Every structure is written in structure tokens, then in C-alpha cells.
């Protein structure tokens, strides 16, 4: 039998591999060249950059490689294979991700290119032109930036900034980047008369001016309230918003008007004035949003015994956690439980002050074992991610990066609360702070989840190797339930670790709100505007001490059928203290995960924005 047709005979592969390293380099060059079409992504801040890239790969069937976050603009930048893939992503603009709408654009390497090249044909560069424009429009005496009617600005028009639709759409992102570099002190911005239909091009404004207090968007083309989701919980100091002469407010339906007000108050927690109308009591609002202690302490202990136990425990625990986690296993027993979850759902400021770390936060080492119950719905998956007993717990510890906690050198960066836990005759310790990742895990659990086979990489190992995940600073919250053991020892009955993006803004720091928020209305044009409705003041109900009222026996049968006894008792307690009706009471409990302390906090934060029919009349 001849094998001539199958392999060409002995040593017939000599010609195929004769080029050696030269051929290999050509392959590398070809791969690099094929993955160098830039793409930019906005509206991704509801989660981590890695989660966004994975979502795009699953949903859009396009792989974005070599991605990074621009620390100035917050834009997520990466590369796709060719222009065709870039066009595919452009067609996906508007797809929902982590509660926001993603927006794709063909990327660039600098602002001059971003403006399409045509914007720098004059003697001034693009950056210089935008800088001069900003300086001319900035009024430092009242801290106001006038960005109204930018398309009619003669300097910008002469430089070709609005010569095409693609260039026009990139103007505001470029402007915000330059404004960030100039570090303008801005309280008010006027964006009137700009033909705006949505806020996609203004996503980065929240990062550039996070403490903005007054904003005018009058004489634009906003038609839907959901466009403001782009800025939800990002402009947390916005006090006044002007929306005159927008289709969204040109309605006479009282229910629709009330819905608009409520949605805007949810998006901007300190919003007081909407188009001249007072929405809520500002003094009550400031009181509810202010930290209740004049000099907040980083540590709280229920008594002296709790202090002694907790401080010794935490100091020794973190020392071993950073040095040798195997020595911690003596603290865990067969019934001990450990779980870890990642919370990347809250937008966070991109901090560039961490030398030695990458600009973006990657949770790759944590996601595989994350037990975030808002994302893991399967009972089987939830149980699989709960470690019980020494063996499973140590295995979970090995899959987490090695760390360094500087609690001895910088105790002010940590906070701790300690309460007695009478159910088990122990104490509950909750520790908040941050840590440095200093080395990869002993066991890389993220690699085990890599797909294989025809749909997930080559089954013959010809695909790309597992990418090493960059290390970075991260913030955390960790709760221990510690009980006494034999011979004076201590046992960790429960250990819950929450990992979140790093921030240097700690809630136990003193953060004073402006005592006299400026009430100046940002740049209203001379055109006539409709007179505002008579102002109304919404008083905020306060938590009241429980008194005589309903009991669990008084709850409707259908409510009792779907709630356990503990939930029924909590619901009754909440109804008595908040005076909410039963529907809003259940909603509050569910959104607080049936936690009394969290429900109290959530009620105080949102009571001012609740309609009057939410309360028992």
C-alpha cells in the first residue's frame, strides 16, 4: 500500500518548515496587523472592562483585543480584526449592558485623529483650538462653562469641527478630555441649543465634572426620560436641571409629568429644582444625605471585650492571610462556611495614581467563584460556589491572588464594626478597606473555565495561551462570625468576602456638603420660556418608633403564603416604623434583601422622592 498521497513520503515536510523563525515572525506580524483596527466603547461603566469585553464577544460575536481604559475620558479602547468587524459593532450601538446603553465608534490614537484629521487643518492644533474655546467660554467668577450652541461658534466652524456627522459626534468626548486636562473649577454648565437627542456623546461629562451642581439642557430634542440613565448615580451633586423647550416636558398629562420628576430624582439624588420648580425640601434632603456624625470614627466596638477580641483576631488573621493562608485553616472547622462575591455593578472613578498597576480593574481571578446572588440564579450554582469545611475553604483561598494589607502602617484606610452575636455566643466583625494584589494565585481558577473545542478555541492547542490577568488595587468588605472554641481558641463559623473596584474615597472620611449650594441658573437664553408651575414642597417622613399597629396575623393571606415567619415579622416592623403602605413596604424589604439595617438606610435615602400614596393616609 502506498502512503504517497497521505503524507508525501519520508521527510517531505522539510520544505514546509524550512523558513523556520522567519515564517514564525511573519505569522506574528500578520496576526498583529490583523488585530489593529481601533474601536472605542462608551457607556460600559456599569461593570468592569473585562465583563464588558466578554459581553461583546458573546452578544456581538466580535472579539476586542488589547483593550484598556483611557484614565482621562473613561473611554474603553481596544482593537478588532478589520473595518468590517468595527462596522458590526457600530450596528450594535445601543445594546443594553449592566443597565446602560453601549455606544461604539471607530477608535483613534489621539484627539487630532479623533476629530477626523480635518479639524486640524488650520494653524492651531485640535487641542489648542478646543483649549482656547473652553477658556473663552469659561466664567471663573461664577464657575460656569457656557457650551451653548457650539455649532455656531465661528472658531470651531472655521476649523472644520462640524464638517461631517462622524466628526460632530466626536466633538464633545474630545472637549471633555481637554477640559479634564485644564482642570476647570465648574459648578454650572449650559448645554442649551445643541440639537441633542441623547447623552451618548456626553457620557464622559460625569467623569470630568462629577460635582456639577447646575445644568441647562433647554432647547434640545430630548424625547424619552430613559436617556438620563447614562448619568444615573454619576452626577450625585446636581441640584438644578433646566429642560425647557424639550419634547419630553411638552406634555399636559399629570401622571406623565410626575413620572418624569420621579425618574429624574432617582437619577440625581440631590436634584431640588427642575426648570424652576422646587421638587423637594432641600434642608431635609441635605440632612438625610449627610453623614450623621460630625467626627466619624473608623472603628466601632459594642464593648471593651469585643474590642480586645476583634483587634487581636484581625491583626493576626490579615498577617497570615498575606503571608501563609494554610496556617489559617486551624480557625475553620467542618461546618465553617466561606463565600466570595464580586460587586462591579456600581460605577467607579478611574484612579490613575496607582503606579505599577494597570489603568483598569480586572476581576478575572474572582469571577469564576463569585457567588453574587444577583447574577447567580441557579440553586446548584449557588451551592457549588459556597465552600464548606477546611478542604473546600483552603482550595478557595488558593484561587485568590496573594495580597498585602497595610492595616498596621495605615489604619486610617480601614474601618471595622464589631457586634456581639448572641445566637452563637460569638461576635460579628465587619472589616472595610483595600489591599494590593502582589502575586498571582497558587491555583489559577480562572484558567479552568477557558472554553475548549471548536467553539472555544482549538482542541489541538493551537489557540492563544491563557492571558495573565493584571494585578491591581481593590477594595473589599469582609464579615466574620467568630465563636469560642475549646481551650480558649476561636472558630470562624462564617466568612464572607466582597471584592469591589478600588476607590480612595472612604465613607468614614469627613465629606462636607456645600453649605450654601449656588442657586444660580446656568445660562438661560433670552428667548421666552414657559412660566414654571407653582413650587411644591415634599416633606420627608422620618422613621418613627414602633407603636400599636398591625401584627403578622393582620397580613393578607396571599402575603403570608409567600413570606416566611421572619420575613413577615420584618415587614410588619418596617410598616410600623416607616408608615409605608404594604405594597411599598414589601418593595423596600425585597430591594434591601430582607435586611433591617439596609432597609432603614434605603428608606432614609429615598423617602423624599416617594409619592404621597406610598404612605398610609
Curated annotation (Swiss-Prot):
- Residue ranges that the Swiss-Prot or TrEMBL entry lists as coiled coil: none
Chief site of localization: nucleus
Gene3D superfamilies annotated for this entry? 3.10.450.50, DNA helicase RuvA subunit, C-terminal domain, Ribonuclease Inhibitor
- Using the record's annotation, list all stretches that form the TAP-C domain: 565-617
Biased composition (Gly residues) is annotated at: 1-10
Pinpoint the residue ranges of every LRR repeat in the record.
185-206, 211-232, 237-258
A biological-process GO annotation:
poly(A)+ mRNA export from nucleus
Q: Which UniProt keywords apply?
A: Cytoplasm, Leucine-rich repeat, mRNA transport, Nucleus, Repeat, Transport
Q: Which family does it belong to?
A: Belongs to the NXF family.
Q: Under what name is this protein listed?
A: mRNA export factor MEX67
Q: Which organism is it from?
A: Candida albicans (strain SC5314 / ATCC MYA-2876)
